[in-house]
Amino acid sequence: MKIRPLHDRVIVKRKEVESKSAGGIVLTGTAAGKSTRGEVLPVGNGRILDNGEIKPLDVKVGDIVIFNDGYGVKSEKIDHEEVLIMSESDILAIVEA
């Protein structure tokens, strides 16, 4: 994938949700709703602080994260693959194994 996020931006690939209906039918894709979990792909070099220093990001490539799918999250198609571009502040948690 040829994309390099800047500053505190993170590229995330949304994980597909699998859920079951009340009748036990497995729902996937749009029927299941949009997932707010994803895998972190490239990350920027960090957030620029008021004093000019760069604070490295807490998330790293390969992390599974839970994110806020709101106003600041941008959806883009890169190399025929849909990805999300967001600030690290849009990430709510890192899922640990």
Curated annotation (Swiss-Prot):
<dbReference type="InterPro" id="IPR020818">
    <property type="entry name" value="Chaperonin_GroES"/>
</dbReference>
<dbReference type="GO" id="GO:0051087">
    <property type="term" value="F:protein-folding chaperone binding"/>
</dbReference>
<dbReference type="GO" id="GO:0005524">
    <property type="term" value="F:ATP binding"/>
</dbReference>
<keyword id="KW-0143">Chaperone</keyword>
<dbReference type="Pfam" id="PF00166">
    <property type="entry name" value="Cpn10"/>
</dbReference>
<dbReference type="InterPro" id="IPR037124">
    <property type="entry name" value="Chaperonin_GroES_sf"/>
</dbReference>
<dbReference type="GO" id="GO:0051085">
    <property type="term" value="P:chaperone cofactor-dependent protein refolding"/>
</dbReference>
<comment type="similarity">
    <text>Belongs to the GroES chaperonin family.</text>
</comment>
<dbReference type="GO" id="GO:0044183">
    <property type="term" value="F:protein folding chaperone"/>
</dbReference>
<dbReference type="GO" id="GO:0046872">
    <property type="term" value="F:metal ion binding"/>
</dbReference>
<comment type="subunit">
    <text>Heptamer of 7 subunits arranged in a ring. Interacts with the chaperonin GroEL.</text>
</comment>
<dbReference type="InterPro" id="IPR011032">
    <property type="entry name" value="GroES-like_sf"/>
</dbReference>
<comment type="function">
    <text>Together with the chaperonin GroEL, plays an essential role in assisting protein folding. The GroEL-GroES system forms a nano-cage that allows encapsulation of the non-native substrate proteins and provides a physical environment optimized to promote and accelerate protein folding. GroES binds to the apical surface of the GroEL ring, thereby capping the opening of the GroEL channel.</text>
</comment>
<keyword id="KW-0963">Cytoplasm</keyword>
<dbReference type="InterPro" id="IPR018369">
    <property type="entry name" value="Chaprnonin_Cpn10_CS"/>
</dbReference>
<dbReference type="GO" id="GO:0051082">
    <property type="term" value="F:unfolded protein binding"/>
</dbReference>
<protein>
    <recommendedName>
        <fullName>Co-chaperonin GroES</fullName>
    </recommendedName>
</protein>
<dbReference type="GO" id="GO:0005737">
    <property type="term" value="C:cytoplasm"/>
</dbReference>
